[in-house]
C-alpha cells in the first residue's frame, strides 16, 4: 500500500473509533458498539507498528480528543475554561495509556501487551476517580448507563466492571482478527470471546429477573420514605443568580411544595421528605442574603422554608450556598450545601465534597486563577468552596436514613457508596443541570444515577432544578420522571433497604487490583528491557 494511503488509513481508523466510543453515550440502546469501539484504533496501531511509523502518539491524542468533544461538548456552555481543561487533559491521559501500551509492544509480543493495556486503563480510571483534578465522565463502564438489564452485576464490580468488559472484549476480538489474517485457527479464541461477551449478559438477566420479582412482591409494603420532589425550573443564567429575587424564587418553591403536599396520598407512618434542588438558596451580594450555618434563621428565605417545614410537619432538604466559621484558621468557609430541616425544628448540613473544577474549585491556583472570571458564579465564591472529610447522612424520627449526593458527586461510584457505609437506607440526589441546556449532558447525568442505584441497591429520589427529576428503583430503572424545563413536582415513595452489596462493602476491587498489577507489569517490563538492552536514548520515540 502506498505511504499516502497508509497515512490516510492511520488517520481515519482512530476517527472511526472516536465515533464508535461516542455513540453509546449519545444514543440509547446501542451498548454493543462499545464492545467493538476500540478495534479500529487497535488496527491502526498494528499498522503503525508493522510499518515502523513514529509519532503515532499524536494520532491517539486526536482520537481521544474527538471522543471527548463529541460526547461532552456541552460542558463548554457552563464553564469554558473547565471544558477546555477537561477535554485536553482527559485526552492527554487516555493517549498516554495507549502510549505505554505501544511501548510495551516493543518490549514483548503476544497477548501480554494487550493485557497490559487493559490493566493500565483500569488503573488509570481508578486513580482518576480519586485525583483532585478529575473528570471521569467518560469511564468506559458508563457506556452501558442506558442498558441496565445487561449490567445488574455492577452491584459486585462497580462501573469499572463495565470498563473491564469493554477492554477485554475488544482485545479478544482484535486477537481473533489478527489470528485470522495470519491463517491461524481461531475456534478456541472465538469461544473465549463469546463467553466473555455472553456470560455477563446472562448473569445480569438472571439477577434482573430476580430483582423484578422482589420489587413486585415488596409493592407498597414494608418501611418506606415518602417524597415530594420539587422542580422549580428557575433559569440558572437569566433568573437564578440575579434576574429573579431570592424571595420570588422561594415563593415559587413553597407554592409547588404546598401543592405537592396537598396532593400527597397518606401512607401510614411513613416519613415525608420534601426535596429541593442544589444551590436553591444563593446570596445576591447583600449580607442579609447570606445563609450562615451558625445563624440560619437570619436568612429570610431559609426562615420561610423552615416555618413551612415545621408547620406542615415534614422534613425538608434544601440546597444552598452556606457559610461557616473555621475557628482553627479564623476564616469563613463557603460550601455548596444540602440543609435538612427536620419536622421537629432541628437543622443539619452536608457539604458537597466532589467539586466542579473551575466553578467550585480552582486547582493549581498560580496557573488557573486568572481563568476564574470565565467560570460560573454560584454566589460570589467562584473556585473557593470548602468540602467535608467524610460523608454524612440525615436520620429522621421515622427511621429514614437518607444520603444526599450533590450534583457531580453522583458520578463517583466509590465515593457515593460511602453514604451507604454511613447507614443510608435510601438516597437522594440534588442538582442543577440547567447550566448545560437541553443537551446530552443532563440526560447522561440522570442515567449515571441509575448506575449508582445498581451498585448500592438503594432507591433514589433525584431533584433537578430544571429537570430531569426522577424516582429510580434499586434496579436502576426510572419509575417516574419530570419533564425538562418545566416547573412541577413528583410525589412518590421508595423502600428502605438495609442490605449491603459486595461493591458497597469492598469498593472498587477491580481498580485496586489493576493498580497493583500495573506496577508489577511495569517493573517486569523495565527489568526485561534492561536485560535485553532495549532501553536506550536511540530507542525513544
List each model region and its residues.
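Membrane-embedded alpha-helical bundles of multi-pass enzymes
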Residues: 2-212, 438, 449-453, 463-464, ...
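Non-cytosolic juxtamembrane linkers/loops
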Residues: 3-5, 196-267, 432-445, 450-457, ...
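Short, conserved active-site loops that position catalytic residues or coordinate cofactors/metal ions
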Residues: 25-42, 67, 231-232, 268-292, ...
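Active-site catalytic loop in hydrolytic enzyme cores
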Residues: 75-81, 127-159, 331-408, 413
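Short, solvent-exposed loop/turn segments at secondary-structure junctions
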Residues: 76-77, 283-284, 325-327, 435-438
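CN hydrolase (nitrilase-like) catalytic-core segments centered on the catalytic cysteine
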Residues: 90-93, 118-119, 273, 279-281, ...
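Soluble catalytic regions of membrane-associated enzymes that act on cell-envelope
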Residues: 205-358, 393-398, 404, 408
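Cytoplasmic C-terminal tails of single-pass
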Residues: 536-541
Amino acid at each position: 500500500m502506498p505511504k499516502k494511503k497508509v497515512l490516510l488509513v492511520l488517520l481515519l481508523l482512530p476517527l472511526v473509533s472516536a465515533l464508535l466510543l461516542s455513540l453509546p453515550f449519545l444514543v440509547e440502546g446501542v451498548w454493543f458498539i462499545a464492545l467493538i469501539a476500540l478495534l479500529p484504533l487497535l488496527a491502526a496501531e498494528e499498522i503503525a507498528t508493522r510499518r515502523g511509523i513514529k509519532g503515532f502518539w499524536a494520532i491517539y491524542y486526536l482520537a481521544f480528543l474527538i471522543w471527548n468533544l463529541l460526547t461532552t461538548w456541552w460542558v463548554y456552555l457552563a464553564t469554558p475554561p473547565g471544558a477546555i481543561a477537561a477535554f485536553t487533559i482527559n485526552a492527554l491521559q487516555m493517549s498516554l495509556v495507549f502510549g505505554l501500551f505501544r511501548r510495551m509492544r516493543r518490549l514483548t509480543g503476544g497477548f501480554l501487551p494487550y493485557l497490559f493495556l487493559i490493566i493500565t486503563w483500569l488503573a488509570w480510571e481508578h486513580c482518576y476517580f480519586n485525583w483532585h483534578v478529575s473528570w471521569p465522565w467518560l469511564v468506559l463502564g458508563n457506556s452501558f448507563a442506558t442498558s441496565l438489564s445487561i449490567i445488574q452485576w455492577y452491584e459486585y464490580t462497580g462501573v469499572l466492571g463495565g470498563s473491564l468488559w469493554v477492554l477485554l472484549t475488544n482485545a479478544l476480538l482484535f486477537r481473533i482478527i489478527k489470528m485470522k489474517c495470519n491463517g491461524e485457527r481461531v475456534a478456541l479464541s472465538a469461544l473465549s470471546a463469546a463467553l466473555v461477551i455472553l456470560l455477563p449478559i446472562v448473569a445480569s438477566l438472571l439477577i434482573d429477573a430476580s430483582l423484578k420479582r422482589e420489587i413486585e412482591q415488596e409493592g407498597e409494603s414494608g418501611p418506606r420514605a415518602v417524597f415530594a420532589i420539587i422542580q422549580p425550573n428557575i433559569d440558572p443564567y437569566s433568573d437564578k443568580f440575579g434576574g429573579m429575587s431570592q424571595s420570588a424564587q422561594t415563593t415559587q418553591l413553597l407554592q409547588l411544595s404546598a401543592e405537592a403536599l396537598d396532593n400527597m396520598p397518606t401512607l401510614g407512618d411513613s416519613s415525608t421528605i420534601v426535596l429541593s434542588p442544589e444551590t436553591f438558596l444563593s446570596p445576591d451580594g447583600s449580607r442579609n442574603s447570606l445563609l450562615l450555618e451558625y445563624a440560619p434563621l437570619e436568612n429570610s428565605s431559609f426562615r420561610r422554608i423552615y416555618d413551612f417545614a415545621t408547620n406542615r410537619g415534614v422534613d425538608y432538604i434544601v440546597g444552598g450556598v452556606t457559610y461557616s466559621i473555621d475557628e482553627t484558621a479564623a476564616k469563613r468557609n463557603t460550601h455548596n450545601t444540602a440543609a435538612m430541616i427536620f419536622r421537629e425544628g432541628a437543622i443539619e448540613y452536608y457539604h458537597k465534597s466532589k467539586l466542579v473544577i473551575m466553578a467550585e474549585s480552582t486547582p493549581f491556583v498560580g496557573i488557573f486563577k486568572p481563568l476564574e472570571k470565565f467560570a460560573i458564579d454560584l454566589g460570589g465564591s467562584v473556585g473557593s468552596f470548602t468540602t467535608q472529610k467524610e460523608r454524612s447522612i440525615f436520620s429522621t424520627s421515622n427511621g429514614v436514613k437518607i444520603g444526599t449526593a450533590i450534583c457531580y458527586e453522583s458520578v463517583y461510584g466509590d465515593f457515593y457508596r460511602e453514604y451507604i457505609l454511613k447507614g443510608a437506607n435510601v438516597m437522594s440526589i440534588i442538582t442543577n443541570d440547567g447550566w448545560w441546556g437541553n443537551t446530552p449532558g443532563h440526560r447522561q447525568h440522570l442515567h449515571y444515577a441509575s448506575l449508582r442505584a445498581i451498585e448500592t441497591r438503594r432507591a433514589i429520589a433525584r431533584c433537578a432544578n430544571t429537570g430531569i427529576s426522577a424516582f429510580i428503583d434499586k434496579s436502576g430503572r426510572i419509575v417516574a420522571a419530570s419533564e425538562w424545563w418545566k416547573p412541577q413536582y413528583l410525589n412518590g415513595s421508595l423502600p428502605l433497604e438495609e442490605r449491603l452489596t459486595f461493591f458497597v462493602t469492598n469498593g472498587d476491587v477491580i481498580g485496586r487490583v489493576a493498580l497493583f498489577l500495573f506496577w508489577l507489569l511495569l517493573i517486569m517490563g523495565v527489568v526485561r528491557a534492561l536485560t535485553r538492552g532495549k532501553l536506550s536514548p536511540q530507542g525513544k520515540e
